[in-house]
């Protein structure tokens, strides 16, 4: 019998945080579930942890590297009615997934909850009850790990061409046919602890606003041009208004 929920966990050389992520799952969900760990590390450093926690394991090092490709492999391997994704440095809150699943029995679409953002000095709970399609068309508000959706409702994979925000693009792609439903309460804790960045990662972050433009081009919303311009200004980018009037040609 297939499980109720599939949980896809991409990982890369972070065994301590992967341990924390996998250990959180048992307290987050009591329904039947499977965990799929997709490892980008050539040494397969996540294998022992995946085995210890009873997870399915796939090592994909050297082929289609990156989060998008890992999540897509997880989608292909998943058997659950519902699916969610968890980054290896984040972890689920107790009963968080159970609350989403309980609500999902009566709703069709993307069911999401709130999240906590934390670092070594502080933690803040983020209420997402205000999130709707318009909010999502400006910037992603729902982090990976905070939502579940029906696996059969997935019509497109994560875009491996994007430098960043592939999770935002994935959600926008599916919101039209999978309405958003909010469930109060923290579902996932997002680790914002600063890490040492390589020059490549730093460059990707500096260019992340270009992915905003790519995504906005796919999802034109002229009534939100002002909000989108304001977001770019907050990133230190000022563009002529006409450059935000997109035709979807991607």
Residue ranges and their predicted role:
Residues 97-125:
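Conserved donor NDP-sugar-binding/catalytic core segment of glycosyltransferases
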Residues 61-78:
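Glycine-rich, basic loop-to-helix element that forms the pyrophosphate-binding segment
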Residues 130-212:
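Conserved nucleotide-sugar donor-binding catalytic segment
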Residues 17, 46, 71, 92-99, ...:
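Acidic donor-diphosphate engagement hotspot in glycosyltransferases and nucleotidyltransferases
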Residues 83:
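Short aromatic/hydrophobic "clamp" motif used to bind/position activated sugar donors
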């Amino acid at each position: 019998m297939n499980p109720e929920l599939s949980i896809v966990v991409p990982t890369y050389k972070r065994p301590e945080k992967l341990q924390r992520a996998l250990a959180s799952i048992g307290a987050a969900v009591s329904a039947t579930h499977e965990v799929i760990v997709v490892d980008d590390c050539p040494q397969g450093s996540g294998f022992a942890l995946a085995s210890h926690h009873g997870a399915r394991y796939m090592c994909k090092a050297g082929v289609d590297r990156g989060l998008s490709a890992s999540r897509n492999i997880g989608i292909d391997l998943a058997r659950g009615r519902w699916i969610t994704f968890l980054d290896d440095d984040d972890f689920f809150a107790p009963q968080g997934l159970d609350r989403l699943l309980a609500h999902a029995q009566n709703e069709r679409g993307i069911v999401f909850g709130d999240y906590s953002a934390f670092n070594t000095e502080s933690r803040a709970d983020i209420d997402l009850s205000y999130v709707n399609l318009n909010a999502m068309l400006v910037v992603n508000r729902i982090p990976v790990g905070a939502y579940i959706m029906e696996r059969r409702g997935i019509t497109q994979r994560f875009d491996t061409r994007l430098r960043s925000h592939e999770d935002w693009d994935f959600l926008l792609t599916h919101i039209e046919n999978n309405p958003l439903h909010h469930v109060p309460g923290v579902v996932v804790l997002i680790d914002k602890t600063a890490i040492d960045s390589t020059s490549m990662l730093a460059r990707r972050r500096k260019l992340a606003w270009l992915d905003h433009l790519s995504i906005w081009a796919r999802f034109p919303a002229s009534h939100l041009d002002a909000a989108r311009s304001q977001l770019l200004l907050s990133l230190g980018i000022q563009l002529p208004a006409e450059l935000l009037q997109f035709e979807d040609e991607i």
